[in-house]
């Protein structure tokens, strides 16, 4: 199958992870999956939610939003509408769950890290790009907190890496990392979140048209794990680079 942008079915879009994008946030990453661009800012605060106080454990949570003109037609800001949409809540919770899968709460101490993931430009896979970029922003925020002794230097709050990618079946062909034009044509689409050692955090799959078979599910999961392995390596390379603060 010939894809719109010339990629093979097993190929990611060009992925870039730019650290230190905002000077104010303790961790800041602009992540790009092709034309999808998401700004991920991590903010560290001392203390935890009331229900967590006295536990000696920290907390990590996330919020997701799209800029009004992130898509080809303008959408109203949810703050103007006066309510947060169900999709926004769902994706915010997904990002938070994904990051918490690789957090040692005890090692984090009673500190809170909030990840704000704002979609600047959308071309499919915004939630998976957000998870992938937010992990790097979280890692930088943890390093910042350790440098300021909010977290003990000998502790390791991050137990591993986490990334995410979309997969789907379009015109009978399993594809990795769908663009918007592919996503809307997909008979089956799926978002897969993996740890760096290949375990699954979350698998969200839907048959938009024909139900999918077990062997097709296995093929999609194989595609996704291979994609997440590539993304984990890109995260590692990004974090290995020197970051000037």
UniProtKB/Swiss-Prot annotation:
GO terms for molecular function: 3'-5'-RNA exonuclease activity; RNA binding; tRNA binding; tRNA nucleotidyltransferase activity. It holds the Pfam family RNase_PH_C. Phosphate binds at residues 87, 125-127. It catalyses: tRNA(n+1) + phosphate = tRNA(n) + a ribonucleoside 5'-diphosphate. Its EC number is 2.7.7.56. It comes from the Bacteria. GO terms for biological process: rRNA catabolic process; rRNA processing; tRNA processing. Keywords: Nucleotidyltransferase, RNA-binding, rRNA processing, Transferase, tRNA processing, tRNA-binding. InterPro entries: ExoRNase_PH_dom1, ExoRNase_PH_dom2, ExoRNase_PH_dom2_sf, PNPase/RNase_PH_dom_sf, Ribosomal_Su5_D2-typ_SF, RNase_PH, RNase_PH_bac-type, RNase_PH_CS. Belongs to the RNase PH family. Homohexameric ring arranged as a trimer of dimers. Phosphorolytic 3'-5' exoribonuclease that plays an important role in tRNA 3'-end maturation. Removes nucleotide residues following the 3'-CCA terminus of tRNAs; can also add nucleotides to the ends of RNA molecules by using nucleoside diphosphates as substrates, but this may not be physiologically important. Probably plays a role in initiation of 16S rRNA degradation (leading to ribosome degradation) during starvation. This is Ribonuclease PH. It comes from Streptomyces coelicolor (strain ATCC BAA-471 / A3(2) / M145). The lineage of its organism: Bacteria, Bacillati, Actinomycetota, Actinomycetes, Kitasatosporales. The gene is rph.
